[in-house]
């Protein structure tokens, strides 16, 4: 009895326990290997579900980029062409639109989306910028994300290009037309202001000759000023001739100096005619012949003087004879 128990314990116990830890150690090492790599979660999906991880939806290629517009061909989903080869990335073109697969929007698979909350491209962009992949990743995400918000309905490529190019031109035309309208509105506004100011300056009331004479007489009577004591007279006068009070006031202000200058000029002309050169007008009539000169004519009477030139000789015809009797023709010189 004593000999059998130790033999059983020594032979049986070590043998089953030794392979167990050996089998457990590789199982623990295997999950540690993918975790040691960067982005192990993404790599795990690439290993198992690479063809099912992403689905390529509508085409996002801008066919009007050269024209400065934005036009899509309307392809709703990527369909690999029969000539595409998985080993050759350049051959992955869509059979519907002919564009490369990279132009289509990449959408994560719905089955894997529940287990993986953040999308793989975002995690790759978050972890890799710190190392050496910072420049390449940013360009691809903006084109897929920006058109996602406003993706047009699937329309054929030719109609889409024509319609969007037309709308682009229309938008440009509308923008230019709105600019023209805005500038035209501003010009009209300024022109309207100028016309308002210009209308105040250029608006002139046309008066009849009767109104001008009456206003001139009234202005002379009032003294070319409108005073409070003359308000009743001004009101009655304006009602008589059919002129507004403000118009009469402006007319008096504008013509005050004009008529004063005319009066001053008329007075100067009268002074020159009357007293400037001591020239008195010669009137035909009865003239008393007082000759202090060389020739005297006797036998006075009514003399009719005919003056041939001012200051020259004059011929006198006498009705009654002079010293010699009969008609005497005399010449006098001053």
Swiss-Prot record:
Q: Which Gene Ontology cellular component terms are annotated?
A: nucleus
Subcellular location field:
Nucleus
| Keywords attached to this entry | DNA-binding, Gibberellin signaling pathway, Homeobox, Metal-binding, Nucleus, Transcription, Transcription regulation, Zinc, Zinc-finger
Q: Which GO terms describe its biological process?
A: DNA-templated transcriptional start site selection; gibberellic acid mediated signaling pathway; positive regulation of DNA-templated transcription; response to blue light; response to gibberellin
DNA-binding region at which residues?
A: 200-263
Low complexity biased stretches: 1-15
A Pfam family assignment: ZF-HD_dimer
This entry's Gene Ontology molecular function terms read: DNA binding; protein homodimerization activity; transcription cis-regulatory region binding; zinc ion binding
Q: What tissues express this gene product?
A: Mostly expressed in rosettes (e.g. young leaves), flowers (e.g. styles), siliques and inflorescence.
Record's Gene3D superfamilies?
Homeodomain-like
Bias-annotated ranges (Gly residues): 309-328
Zinc finger annotations (ZF-HD dimerization-type) as residue ranges: 56-107
- SUPFAM superfamilies in the record: Homeodomain-like (SSF46689)
Keyword Ribonucleoprotein: yes or no? no
UniProt xrefs under PROSITE patterns: ZF_HD_DIMER (PS51523)
Per the entry, induction is: By gibberellic acid (GA).
* Site keyed Required for DNA-binding: positions: 252
Q: Give me the stretches of Pro residues compositional bias.
A: 136-155
Query: Where are the stretches annotated Disordered?
Result: 1-33, 103-164, 292-334
Q: What subunit structure does UniProt give?
A: Homo- and heterodimer with other ZFHD proteins. Interacts with MIF1, MIF2 and MIF3; these interactions prevent nuclear localization and DNA-binding to inhibit transcription regulation activity. Binds to ZHD1, ZHD2, ZHD4, ZHD5, ZHD6, ZHD7 and ZHD8. Interacts with KIN10 and KIN11.
- What role is this protein assigned? Putative transcription factor. Probably involved in establishing polarity during leaf development through the gibberellic acid (GA) signaling pathway.
PANTHER family in the record, alphabetically?
A: ZINC-FINGER HOMEODOMAIN PROTEIN 10, ZINC-FINGER HOMEODOMAIN PROTEIN 2
What is this protein's record name?
Answer: Zinc-finger homeodomain protein 10
Q: Which organism is it from?
A: Arabidopsis thaliana
């Amino acid at each position: 009895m004593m000999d059998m128990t130790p033999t059983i314990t020594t032979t049986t116990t070590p043998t089953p326990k030794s392979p167990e830890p050996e089998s457990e150690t590789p199982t623990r090492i295997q999950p540690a290997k993918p975790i040691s790599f960067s982005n192990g979660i993404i790599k795990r999906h690439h290993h198992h579900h690479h063809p099912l991880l992403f689905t390529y939806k509508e085409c996002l290629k801008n066919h009007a980029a050269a024209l400065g517009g934005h036009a899509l061909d309307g392809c709703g989903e990527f369909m690999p062409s029969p000539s595409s080869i998985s080993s050759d990335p350049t051959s992955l073109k869509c059979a519907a639109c002919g564009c490369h697969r990279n132009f289509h929007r990449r959408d994560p698979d719905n089955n894997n989306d529940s287990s993986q909350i953040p999308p793989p491209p975002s995690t790759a962009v978050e972890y890799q910028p710190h190392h050496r992949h910072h420049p390449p990743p940013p360009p691809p995400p903006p084109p897929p994300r920006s058109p996602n918000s406003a993706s047009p309905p699937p329309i054929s490529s030719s109609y889409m290009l024509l319609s969007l190019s037309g709308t682009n031109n229309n938008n440009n035309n509308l923008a230019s037309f709105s600019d023209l309208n805005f500038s035209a509105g501003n010009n009209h506004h300024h022109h309207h202001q100028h016309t308002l100011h210009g209308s105040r300056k250029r608006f002139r009331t046309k008066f009849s000759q009767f109104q001008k004479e009456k206003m001139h007489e009234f202005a002379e009577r009032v003294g070319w000023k409108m005073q409070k004591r003359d308000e009743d007279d001004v009101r009655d006068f304006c009602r008589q001739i059919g002129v507004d009070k403000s118009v009469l006031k402006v007319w008096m202000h504008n013509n005050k100096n004009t008529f004063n200058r005319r009066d001053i000029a008329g007075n100067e002309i009268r002074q020159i005619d009357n007293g400037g050169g001591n020239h008195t007008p010669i009137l035909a009539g009865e003239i008393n012949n007082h000759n202090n000169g060389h020739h005297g004519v006797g036998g006075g009477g009514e003399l009719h003087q005919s003056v041939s030139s001012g200051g020259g000789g004059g011929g006198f015809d006498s009705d009654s004879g002079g010293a010699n009797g009969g008609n005497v023709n005399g010449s006098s010189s001053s």
